[in-house]
C-alpha cells in the first residue's frame, strides 16, 4: 500500500 493520489496494494 502506497499513499498518494493513487494507492496500490502491497504485493
Curated annotation (Swiss-Prot):
Modified residues (Threonine amide): 11
Domain of life: Eukaryota
Pfam families per record: Periviscerokin
Cell compartment(s), UniProt: Secreted
Keywords: Amidation, Neuropeptide, Secreted
Protein's UniProt name: Periviscerokinin-1
One GO CC annotation: extracellular region
InterPro entries according to UniProt: Periviscerokinin
Keyword Secreted assigned: yes
Source organism: Polyphaga aegyptiaca
Cited function: Mediates visceral muscle contractile activity (myotropic activity).
Family to which this protein belongs: Belongs to the periviscerokinin family.
GO biological process, one term: neuropeptide signaling pathway
Amino acid at each position: 500500500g502506497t499513499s498518494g493520489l493513487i494507492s496500490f496494494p502491497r504485493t
